[in-house]
Each structure stands twice: as structure tokens, then as C-alpha cells.
Curated annotation (Swiss-Prot):
Organism: Nostoc sp. (strain PCC 7120 / SAG 25.82 / UTEX 2576)
Start and end residues of each KH-like domain: 353-438
A biological process from GO: ribosome biogenesis
Lineage of producing organism: Bacteria, Bacillati, Cyanobacteriota, Cyanophyceae, Nostocales
Protein name per the record: GTPase Der
Gene3D superfamilies registered for this protein in UniProt: 3.30.300.20, P-loop containing nucleotide triphosphate hydrolases (3.40.50.300)
Length: 453
């Protein structure tokens, strides 16, 4: 992306994520009093003294333990260092150096990037200098006493850091498409992201809940830039403790809001679940473009009716996103994965599309001719005066009528179907705003008002 990268390294629970949030000016990396909360590489933009760069939050390093995720976390930290221009090694000033710090320091001395030693949790400036002095023994140069929570000392650290960052020679205007990858735990979201990125960017494991942060990955295809946001799987509320998992779900919903297009990942073996339906409803509520990705398609036993039956099931159970394209893929084998980005680009274009008022009213005129608006019990018929598009993302059309409450849900759905049949809008929700307007207000409008239906 053109910006230098700074990797944040350290053993568990020394305050790496807190420092990342301090440098980035926001709480995006999950911070919780539990060792090993951050498992993946989380990229955030940072800015200091007219210099822009990215900070990369990595999992807590442990070298003498190979249980559960720890070897994978080491792999992620090494990958972060390989793409970094510098590293900040975070240690705990309150506990002093220990054997784990010494192991990490020895490992960092073998890496080809400059390393800056941040002695965190030095809340008192006077006492902090004494605490930091104990870390000279790690052999990484000057220890910088800091408080990631309060910001003390971070300025001095950053002043020295930016001296070692390479200049940004060219930073192009980036017209990127932001994509949120969401779904229940263990449906293959991280495998899908890695298939896009061409590397093991995110820890992949059959253990549910492996990915906890919303993580941004940048890729480019055919001149188009994409920002991929992988999120923790979304579980039913009753199975969530109000700890780290709660914050991850909140982060996933925020990722939907950030996105231009959402990939709703369905497990082909499990089919559409109640939780998938709720996610589809969330996408609709947020007004986001969507592509439904049925993953693990390679594991499904197939006959000549399989795809037909599956499509019927999706249509029946995912009615919230019936307007979305569906693609059947295997993130493991790579089957049809690249095709997803084509659908994303198309959905994004439809999401931002604007239609002229004259075309909208031609559609309305045809729709009313084929199916007249409903009539009230008193014999008064509903009447659509005109329509005009008032916004995009999602496309939103205001319909001015004689009495909005006269138009029941069935007729409103009929009008939406007519817009879709005539104008497309594949991959994006559309919103219709029904507005009551008196006849005299319509007739006294300016000469430039929309064509009356």
C-alpha cells in the first residue's frame, strides 16, 4: 500500500494491543486482561510528526510451549517482521526482564529490521527510568519507558522510530472496495481470506473462535484495490460470555458497517442456519451490498439435482438477501474463489449506481399500468405521483403518493420487484421511501420537478 509497516512484538499480556491502539488513536485491537487475546496480524494506520505508517499487532510470543495456537502465533509474528520496516519490542516494566523476554530478544537480534525496546507500564516518569534501565541487559539498545494507557513516553519512542522508516516515494489515491467477510465460527472465513491473499495471513484452525480481531488485508486485482476485513465468527448470544468473544461480535458488526460489500459465508455441509438468517437480516438493515459465498462445496456429495435443491433452499431461507449473487466455492482448493471478486466489484457498482428520474418514472408508469395501486374501503384509490432517487449506497428512491398508508406491504414489494426486473440492482438492497403528498403540492411544483406518473 506504500506505507512503511511497524511490527509490535512481545510476550503475552505486556500491553501490545494497548500500545497499538495508542499509536493508531482508536480501540480496534481487542484489549482484555487475558494472555494471548490477539492471535492474528492486525493492521492499523498511524501518524506521527508528518509521517504516516502502519502498525501491525501480533499475538503474544511464547517459545517454550507448543500447545494450541502458540506455534501459529510465532509464524504470524515472523511473517509480520518479514514485511516490516521496523519493530517495537514491548516488555513489562513492572515485572522486569524474564527468560521469555530474553528468548524473544535473542530471536529479534537475528532479524534484519531495527528493533526499538518499549518498556511498558511505567506509569511514573521518575520510577519509569529506573524500571527501564533493567532492560539494557537484553542487548537491544536504549529501553524507552512508556505508558501505553496514558501515553507517557510514546513521543520519545516515536521520534526515534520514524528516523528509521523509509520514505514514502509514491502514495497513490486508492479507490478501494472494502469487503467484510462474515459468518458463523469455523465456516472458512480465514481460509477464504488466505486464498485471496495468497499466504497464510490469518491463523486457520478447526478450533472454533480462532480469529478474534477484525483484520484488514490489502490486495489488488486487475487494477482494482480491495480491503478485506476478516472477522470473528458470530455466535448466538446465549453461548457468549461477556468477555473477549462479546467484543469480537461487536467488532464484526462494526466491520459490516465499515464495508462496501459483505461476503456472507455459509457452510455448505450445514446449510443455512438460524444464525445465518440473522446475519442476512443485519446486512439488509445496514443497507450493504452482499455476495453469498457457499464454502466447502467440494465436500458436498452431488447429483444432478444438488445445485437446484440448494438454490431453492437458499431462496427460501435467505429471503433477506434474495437480491444477492450466490457463488459455490472451496477456499481449500481455490475453486471459484477468484470469481468472488468479480461479483464483489459488480455489487459495489450497483450499490453506488444512480438512475435518472425519467427512467424511474417510466418503470413506475409501466408498473401502475399492469397493477393498479390498492383502493381503500371508502373507494379511494392509491396514486403514485412520481419517484426520484435521493441517495446511493444503498440506492434509495422516494415515491410521492397521495396517501402512503394506503399502499400495503404486498404492493410495496411489487413495486420493488418491478424496479429490480427493469433496472437490475443485483447485489445491493434498494430502499423505497413512501411519502404522502397532496395533489396541489404536486401540481404547484417547479417546472423542473420529476415527471408525474
Amino acid at each position: 500500500m506504500g506505507l512503511p509497516i511497524v511490527a509490535i512484538i512481545g510476550r503475552p499480556n505486556v500491553g501490545k494491543s494497548t500500545l497499538v491502539n495508542r499509536l493508531a488513536g482508536e480501540q480496534t485491537a481487542i484489549v482484555h486482561d487475558e494472555p494471548g487475546v490477539t492471535r492474528d496480524r492486525t493492521y492499523l494506520p498511524a501518524y506521527w510528526s508528518d509521517r504516516e505508517f502502519q502498525v501491525v499487532d501480533t499475538g503474544g510470543l511464547v517459545f517454550n510451549d507448543d500447545t494450541e495456537f502458540l506455534p501459529l502465533i510465532r509464524q504470524q509474528a515472523l511473517a509480520a517482521l518479514h514485511e516490516a520496516s521496523a519493530a517495537i519490542f514491548v516488555v513489562n516494566g513492572q515485572t522486569g526482564p524474564n527468560s521469555a523476554d530474553e528468548e524473544i530478544a535473542e530471536w529479534l537480534r537475528q532479524q534484519p529490521v531495527p528493533v526499538f525496546l518499549a518498556v511498558n507500564k511505567c506509569e511514573s516518569p521518575d520510577q519509569g527510568s529506573i524500571q527501564a534501565s533493567e532492560f539494557w541487559e537484553l542487548g537491544l539498545g536504549e529501553p524507552y519507558p512508556i505508558s501505553a494507557i496514558h501515553g507517557n513516553g510514546t513521543g520519545e519512542l516515536l521520534d526515534e522510530l520514524i528516523k528509521h522508516l523509509p520514505p514514502v516515494t509514491e502514495l497513490e489515491e486508492n479507490n478501494e472496495i472494502k469487503i467484510a467477510i462474515i459468518g458463523r465460527p469455523n465456516v472458512g472465513k480465514s481460509s477464504l481470506l488466505n486464498a485471496f491473499a495468497g499466504e497464510e495471513r490469518v491463523i486457520v484452525s478447526p478450533i472454533s473462535g480462532t480469529t478474534r480481531d477484525a483484520i484488514d488485508t490489502f490486495i489488488e486485482r486487475d487494477g482494482q484495490n480491495y480491503r478485506l476485513i476478516d472477522t470473528a465468527g458470530i455466535r448466538k448470544k446465549k453461548s457468549i460470555d461477556y468477555g473477549t468473544e462479546f467484543f469480537s461480535i461487536n467488532r464484526a458488526f462494526k466491520a459490516i458497517r465499515r464495508a462496501d460489500v459483505v461476503l456472507l459465508v455459509i457452510d455448505a455441509l450445514d446449510g443455512v442456519t438460524e444464525q445465518d438468517q440473522k446475519l442476512a437480516g443485519r446486512i439488509l438493515d445496514e443497507g450493504k451490498a452482499c455476495v453469498v459465498v457457499v464454502n466447502k462445496w467440494d465436500a458436498v456429495e452431488k447429483d444432478s439435482y444438488t445445485i437446484y435443491d440448494y438454490e431453492k433452499n437458499l431462496e427460501a431461507r435467505l429471503h433477506f438477501t434474495e437480491w444477492a449473487d450466490t457463488i459455490y466455492v472451496s477456499a481449500v482448493t481455490g475453486q471459484r474463489v477468484e470469481k468472488i471478486l468479480e461479483l464483489v466489484t459488480k455489487a459495489n457498482e450497483e450499490h453506488k449506481r444512480r438512475v435518472s428520474t425519467s427512467v424511474i418514472n417510466e418503470v413506475l408508469e409501466d408498473a401502475v399500468r399492469w397493477h393498479s395501486p390498492p383502493t381503500s374501503r371508502g373507494g379511494r384509490q392509491g396514486r403514485i405521483y412520481y419517484g426520484t432517487q435521493v441517495s446511493t449506497q444503498p440506492p434509495t428512491i422516494a415515491l410521492f403518493v397521495n396517501e402512503a398508508k394506503r399502499f400495503n406491504d404486498n404492493y410495496r414489494r411489487y413495486i420493488e420487484r418491478q424496479f429490480r426486473q427493469q433496472l437490475g440492482f443485483k447485489g445491493t438492497p434498494i430502499r423505497l421511501l413512501w411519502r404522502s403528498k397532496k395533489v396541489r403540492d404536486v401540481e404547484s411544483g417547479s417546472a423542473n420537478r420529476a415527471t408525474r406518473v
